Amino acid sequence: MTREPDSTVEQQHGNGHLENGTEQDTLDFSRQIKTEDLSEALQTGIPHRPCQLSQASMMGGGQMTGDFTSLHPLQQLVLVPSHLQSASQYLLSQSQSGQQGLLQQNHLSLNQQQGGILQPQTGLGLASQAVGCPGLPGSSLESHLEMGHLHAPKHFSVVPEDPSDLEELEKFAKTFKQRRIKLGFTQGDVGLAMGKLYGNDFSQTTISRFEALNLSFKNMCKLKPLLEKWLNDAESAPSDTALTPSTNYAQLSEMFGRKRKKRTSIETNIRLTLEKRFEDNPKPISEEISMIAEQLVMEKEVVRVWFCNRRQKEKRINCPMNIPLKSPVYNSRMVPTSVSLGSMSMTPVHNTMTSTVTSSCSPVSSSRPSSPTSGLEPSSPGSSLNSPKPTVNTSSYNNSSSWYRWNHSQYFH
């Protein structure tokens, strides 16, 4: 029984020392906020304080619960630096494993749950330390952000810059087309010449797409040096031939492709002479063509081609005049009628005119069947008008009354 008061006295004595220690800690931490020189000493001493709390909590259970409320300032003082260290470690240790990052996040959430009502005060402490103490981990956040901002452009500048950009390619394609036309080469000639010279055979479509900028950027960059080399060789070839006359033009044409034939322009006086010769003989023979070429000091092939083109032009000019008109439907009907009328003899008409006038002049007689002396078939002339083509009996050609009845003007009225 005597030992129990001694133990309680020792516990109270220990609690007194603990309270003295907490007061001393609060003073030290307040000095840490006001002064910047004690930052390193506090960082080394603060991590040991949670161990003292754990040892003290293991001592008297009932009595420590009563004094636990008095230790809230100490918990606040301990939580502030640990929160700062964990935040700085979380930002600085991005290259570490994911498990360590998860543990730090859990530690932050536990500290926030234990703090409870003390979160606004810890926020104020964080703001004050971040502003007043550049040596603390708060300043390391800004330095880390600045370092990250400096290292960021390295990720975007991965692709190196190409010396030949789109503007240079567009300019080269335009100049290449102009110089190629000036030299007299076609797009197909360029493709064949590049195949003979450099071993890279290109089609006419590829050269056309290059000049029109319809190829991809990568293919344009590959094709540009080859075309530039061919263009320089083609332009320097005539100057070399002037220096060395032994060089044959056929060899150059085989090397750089087939040159396009230039359009022949004929003078006005020569054209008039050729027109006169064409009026005399539109289709001269080979000997006459050679004689005309010698007289006009021209090539025989040029004269021959001119006569061929002139004959084609003459066909185009005279073609609408020579085409016969399509005969209409009534033409085929009128031709045999006119022939038959022209072949009839007019002598019976004068002989029997008086006998047929009375029968043809009356409109009633046209609707009635004719008399046996008329020489027509039993069908009446009124019914024959309804048919599209009247049928005339061959025996009526000998009788003048039938012919007069068909051709008299009053009959149609």
Curated annotation (Swiss-Prot):
An annotated GO cellular component of this protein is: nucleus
Disordered: annotated segments: 1-26, 346-398
- GO MF annotation terms: DNA-binding transcription factor activity, RNA polymerase II-specific; RNA polymerase II cis-regulatory region sequence-specific DNA binding
Q: Mostly located where?
A: nucleus
Which positions does the record tag as DNA-binding?
259-318
Q: Name one GO biological process term.
A: regulation of transcription by RNA polymerase II
Q: Which UniProt keywords apply?
A: DNA-binding, Homeobox, Nucleus, Transcription
- One Pfam family hit: Homeodomain
Q: Which residues form the POU-specific domain?
A: 161-235
Compositional bias per record (Low complexity), positions renumbered to this chain: 354-398
Tell where it localizes: Nucleus
Q: What does this protein do?
A: Transcription factor that binds to the octamer motif (5'-ATTTGCAT-3') and regulates cell type-specific differentiation pathways.
Membership in a protein family: Belongs to the POU transcription factor family. Class-2 subfamily.
- Protein name, UniProt field: POU domain, class 2, transcription factor 3S
- Species whose genome carries this gene: Xenopus laevis
